[in-house]
């Protein structure tokens, strides 16, 4: 029997162990997509206890509304163990909340959360034991002592000891980026903290709050909008500002990828109806969103910004809990959509005029991996190796099986050697161990191919592939 999560955890062969320990393990991390707040980096926040880091909490905003923040992966685990909501997003004492989580974690055999938590305990707290209900007090005291007193356990300290070269935050076009500016001007902060341009609220024309958001965008740029191109021009102005602040990527979170034949007139007609409070048909909404996606894609090419597209998520399916807690609190699911025609049409439209940017495609539905893998090869060019990427296994796919499936699909239908690798997509400063887990799985996959005689034991090429996927491909892709 193997020891629990030892140094060769998940590395099944001598070749896998060699590739990981000698090439992948110590390389810097490019975490090009996450949701951590830049303010906490600048202020170098120190957390009081492990529950604050892992479980988040609840605060009342200036307008009196409730805001729930934290790791919804962990919240789902707790709910699945029958934990009352007051211990999850409520105001129960942190020690009691942590106890409930520890008890739930003990039941999470096979869940990636189990691996993530123990990798974090091992790396950041030096704890080699097992967290469950019986050990919760021991772990609570150990973690809190380090969080409160160890100089390396502030936010910046965690980033530094994780060897993070770049953090790609997720930011709205109307954001002032004040914290990014302060970070950029602070010579003591070595990590690159790059804003990412996420204009979802300007594209989601059929969702509640669209008109209110457009008015906020108007205020930021100082003019009123009469047409769809007015929105595009305003977004370009904001994109220019983001690029000045170090932006390297955009991000689009879509329920599904729309594509219909459209033009400025159709998009403007839909825009005017929405601003007047009139309901839109799906076709009208898609005409506007398609027009914006095409226009933004061209701008991303112009400013050398990668275009990330996340889709196939059905959000807030539990309406009772959504109304109580708001979005991003653990009530989303995989959607079944067919993005093949829309995605290929979007890329084809951009390619026709030589205006296709670098694109990273993520589907929450693993059934789409093969389809996306074949799209890649149809639109690659000489701008950069792996210009069109099959995004890392995302969210519910971020499991051992999901990562293997994504990498095997890319290897089978494209070039795994040009993959830009892992991202955390996380709200936690302890989540960089997910890069370790990914690198172990990647080295194990490649190591097995070598050991089985499916790929030669060519040291020079293997080193290049492993180091590229771990770090250098992303460094090149995001021009670090």
Predicted region positions:
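A short acidic, glycine-rich active-site loop
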Residues: 281-282, 331-337
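Short, basic/hydrophobic alpha-helical segments
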Residues: 346-352
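Active-site loop ensemble at the mouth of alpha/beta enzyme cores that anchors a bound cofactor
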Residues: 322-334
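Divalent-cation-assisted or electrostatically stabilized phosphate/pyrophosphate-binding catalytic cores
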Residues: 339-343
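C-terminal amphipathic alpha-helical interaction region
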Residues: 307-309
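Hard-cation-handling environments
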Residues: 318
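Metal-cofactor-binding active-site regions of metalloenzymes
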Residues: 2-303, 355-357, 361-373, 377-480
């Amino acid at each position: 029997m193997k020891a629990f999560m030892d140094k060769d955890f998940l590395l099944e062969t001598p070749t896998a162990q060699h590739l990981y320990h000698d090439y992948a393990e110590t390389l810097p991390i490019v975490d090009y997509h996450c949701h951590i707040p830049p303010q906490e980096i600048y202020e170098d926040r120190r957390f009081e206890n492990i529950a604050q880091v892992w479980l988040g909490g609840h605060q009342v905003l200036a307008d009196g509304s409730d805001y729930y923040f934290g790791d919804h992966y962990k919240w789902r685990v707790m709910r699945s163990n029958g934990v009352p909501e007051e211990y999850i997003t409520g105001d129960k004492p942190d020690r009691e909340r942590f106890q409930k989580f520890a008890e739930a974690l003990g039941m999470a055999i096979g869940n990636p959360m189990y691996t993530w938590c123990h990798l974090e305990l091992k790396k950041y707290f030096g704890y080699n034991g097992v967290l469950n209900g019986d050990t919760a007090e021991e772990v609570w005291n150990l973690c809190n002592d380090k969080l409160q007193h160890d100089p390396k356990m502030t936010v910046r300290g965690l980033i530094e000891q994780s060897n993070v070269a770049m953090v790609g935050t997720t930011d709205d076009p109307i954001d002032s980026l004040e914290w990014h500016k302060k970070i950029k001007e602070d010579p003591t902060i070595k990590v690159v903290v790059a804003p990412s341009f996420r204009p979802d609220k300007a594209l989601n024309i059929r969702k509640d709050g669209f008109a209110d958001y457009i008015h906020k965008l108007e205020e930021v740029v100082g003019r009123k909008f009469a047409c769809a191109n007015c929105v595009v021009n305003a977004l370009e102005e904001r994109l220019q500002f983001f690029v000045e602040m170090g932006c390297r990527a955009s991000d689009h979170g879509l329920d599904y990828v729309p594509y219909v034949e459209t033009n400025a007139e159709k998009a403007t007609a839909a825009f005017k109806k929405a601003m007047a409070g009139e309901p839109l048909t799906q076709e009208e909404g898609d005409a506007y969103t398609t027009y914006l996606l095409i226009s933004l894609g061209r701008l991303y090419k112009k400013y050398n910004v990668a275009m990330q597209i996340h889709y196939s998520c059905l959000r807030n399916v539990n309406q009772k809990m959504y109304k109580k807690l708001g979005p991003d609190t653990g009530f989303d699911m995989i959607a079944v959509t067919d993005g093949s025609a829309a995605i290929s049409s979007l890329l084809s439209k951009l390619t026709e005029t030589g205006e296709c940017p670098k694109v990273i495609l993520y589907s929450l539905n693993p059934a789409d991996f093969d389809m996306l893998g074949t799209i890649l090869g149809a639109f690659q060019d000489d701008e950069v190796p792996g210009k069109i990427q099959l995004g890392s296994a995302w969210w519910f796919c971020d499991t051992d099986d999901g990562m293997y499936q994504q990498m095997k699909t890319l290897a089978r239908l494209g070039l795994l050697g040009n993959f830009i690798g892992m991202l955390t997509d996380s709200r936690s400063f302890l989540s960089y161990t997910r890069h370790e887990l990914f690198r172990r799985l990647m080295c194990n996959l490649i190591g097995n191919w070598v050991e089985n005689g499916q790929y030669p034991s060519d040291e020079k090429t293997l080193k290049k592939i492993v180091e590229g996927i771990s770090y250098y491909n992303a460094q090149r892709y995001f021009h670090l």
